[in-house]
Regions:
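Short amphipathic, basic-aromatic surface patches that mediate peripheral association
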Residues: 23, 28-68
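Bacterial Sec-dependent N-terminal signal peptides
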Residues: 1-24
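Solvent-exposed serine/threonine-rich low-complexity stretches and specific carbohydrate-binding patches
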Residues: 88-108, 144-147
Length: 158
């Protein structure tokens, strides 16, 4: 009886693994899209702008658990399928810019800091969104949302 339950549990877990993998394969290539972006601002406000998109030959991130539900980090990078507006990838992260915004200098100066994040390379057009946590309500609010076509001539293929 224990063997039957163990085999059934193993079969169920294998099926979940196959479905998670197929979701990756449905939306992404096995390579990376590096998103170089600037975070600019001061203590009171901030904004973001994409500086460069670069195709990289290998995806070293997860192929399962593509949506980060942890809520950790001061920022999130989200990827939405353009056709359905479905969230297909997300990751939380922190930056030195976020720490700098808490300094005395940020009360009187505005600065811009360059950052990079890698996402799986999409097969079809997507929206890339960068959100920031608002310390007042602890919710994430969008800093930018930009359409990215994987066939674009503006993606550095070098």
């Amino acid at each position: 009886m224990k063997i039957k339950i163990s085999l059934l549990l193993l079969a169920v877990l294998c099926n979940f693994s196959v479905f998670a993998q197929s979701d990756f394969d449905k939306y992404f290539e096995k390579k990376s899209l590096r998103v170089d972006f600037a975070l600019s601002g001061n203590l009171k406000s901030q904004s973001a702008a994409i500086q460069q998109l670069r195709e990289e030959p290998v995806w070293g991130g997860p192929v399962k658990n593509l949506i980060d539900k942890s809520g950790y980090g001061g920022y999130y990078i989200n990827v939405y399928d353009k056709a359905t507006n479905k969230l297909i990838y997300s990751r939380g992260f922190n930056t030195l810019f976020e720490e700098w915004r808490s300094t005395e200098q940020a009360k009187t100066e505005t600065q811009s800091w360059t950052n990079s994040a890698s996402v799986p390379f999409p097969k079809t057009p997507v929206y890339i969104e960068i959100t920031a946590r608002d310390k007042a309500d602890m919710q994430f609010h969008p800093l930018l949302k930009q359409e990215v076509d994987p066939k674009s001539i503006f993606i550095d293929r070098g």
